[in-house]
Amino acid sequence: MKDKVTIHTLKRFKQIGQKICMVTAYDATFAHILEEAGADVLLIGDSLGMVIQGHDSTLPVTMDQMVYHTAAVARGARRAHVVADLPFMSYQVSNQEAVRNAGRLVAEGGAGSIKLEGGAEFADTVRAIVRASIPVMGHLGLTPQSVHKMGGYVVQGRGEDQARQILDDALALEQAGAYALVLEGVPMDLARTVTQRLSIPTIGIGAGVDCDGQVLVCYDLLGMNPDFKPKFVKRYANLHGSITEAAGAYFAEVRKGAFPDEEHSFKATKNIRLAPGAPAPAARVEPSAPAEAGEKLGPVYGRPA
């Protein structure tokens, strides 16, 4: 295993010009696969409200749900840095509540850092969380928790005033102690300027190639939803098609009685005859066979190798 990725690793990547690869994960199996593929950072995004739970926004996601999914991802990751979103209304009410909830993601969920949305108005919140020894990643531009305020999922920072505000917010978050910053749904020229002005890494999603790294929702890059086609997503696979084909083949074999076949079934160790209607024999306790003598079902389901 390569060295564990930390926030200092990510800062060093920016300094040497090595791009940061970040992707969402919501369970241990995906975490293990994505880490094996080379992920530097695994983000447990509140996007799970949409891609896992079926909501039309991230707003219904709760702290308990974020802790649950964060813990699952942390169990599947060994090398990658694990960062978890603070969900809607988990940090906006007070700094005390923000620190408590950030602490839950670290203590109960096993996250290495947390991410929150918002600009200079949350600089004090960032300071409070960092003071509690919890690293914070910021998030500017198209911030999904502010979907109603923005009037939908629309590109941010196209006008000069809005672009200047995003730059000012980025500088404020860096000053407050954020170790990295997600830039979502902003023009590539603005993302380039912000990246050049900051000493901390920027990670883009729909923000052009000049950010210090990139992040995508794993379900999007894997082609799990053919009806979701945003401009900023490139599909590297068609898992929707592959899964449909594989599951369809399974269903077809079940319906025609072809599965399970002899290869996928178990046999008794000796011939057993059970006469119809015969009374059941008295129970006889046999000595336990050595564990190695029994036929094993296979590796423990779901546990990474």
From Swiss-Prot:
Principal cellular location given in the protein's record: cytoplasm
EC number: 2.1.2.11
Reactions catalysed, as given in the entry: 3-methyl-2-oxobutanoate + (6R)-5,10-methylene-5,6,7,8-tetrahydrofolate + H2O = 2-dehydropantoate + (6S)-5,6,7,8-tetrahydrofolate
Binding-site list for 3-methyl-2-oxobutanoate: D46, S47, D85, K115
Cofactor: Mg(2+)
InterPro entries per record: Pantoate_hydroxy_MeTrfase, Pyrv/PenolPyrv_kinase-like_dom, Pyrv_kinase-like_dom_sf
Keywords, sorted A to Z: Cytoplasm, Magnesium, Metal-binding, Pantothenate biosynthesis, Transferase
Cofactor binding, per record: Binds 1 Mg(2+) ion per subunit.
Protein's cellular compartments: Cytoplasm
GO cellular component, one term: cytoplasm
Pathway this chain belongs to: Cofactor biosynthesis; (R)-pantothenate biosynthesis; (R)-pantoate from 3-methyl-2-oxobutanoate: step 1/2
GO biological process terms on file: pantothenate biosynthetic process
Descriptive protein name: 3-methyl-2-oxobutanoate hydroxymethyltransferase
Organism: Myxococcus xanthus (strain DK1622)
